[in-house]
Amino acid sequence: MIETNSQPDWRDNGVRVVRADNLDTNTPQTPGMNRAAAINYARVGAQKLWAGTVTIHPNAKTGAHHHGALESVIYVLRGRARMRWGNQLEYVAEAGPGDFIYVPPYVPHQEINASTQEPLEC
C-alpha cells in the first residue's frame, strides 16, 4: 500500500448542496413533462447518477427509454406514479407520495402519471 501525506481537498470535492432555485432546466424534455437537473456529471461530477425534479402533466407518459449506465432514483412528492419496465414494458408498479422508485442502469422503462386530473410531482 502506498501512503501519501496529502489530504483530500474536501472543500471543493466534498458535500455539494444544489439549491432548489439553481436547477438546470436545459435538459432533454418530453412532451407533457417538465424536467430540471440537480445532480449529474456536468453539475457536480456524479459518475453514474442523475437526480432532479420532474413534473408529469395529468394523463401524460414518457416513451419507452433507458438511462444508459446511469442509476435513477425517483421520490414521489405528489400524485400517483405508474412505472412500466421490461423489454416489452410487461411489468407494472405504482408509487405514491413518500415512496421511492429505483431504476437500475439500462432497464427499459416508462413513467406514467396515473391521474387524469392532477400533476405528478417527483
Residues covered by each model-derived region:
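A short beta-strand-loop-beta hairpin characteristic of the jelly-roll/cupin
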Residues: 61, 67-97, 107
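Conserved short histidine dyad/triad with adjacent acidic residue
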Residues: 34-40, 52-68, 105
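General detector of folded, globular domains
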Residues: 31, 36-40, 48-51, 90-97, ...
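A short hydrophobic beta-strand segment most commonly corresponding to one strand
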Residues: 53-54, 73, 102, 117-122
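Short strand-connecting beta-turns/loops that link adjacent beta-strands
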Residues: 43-44, 69, 88, 116-117
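Ligand-binding loop in jelly-roll beta-barrel domains
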Residues: 94-97, 105-122
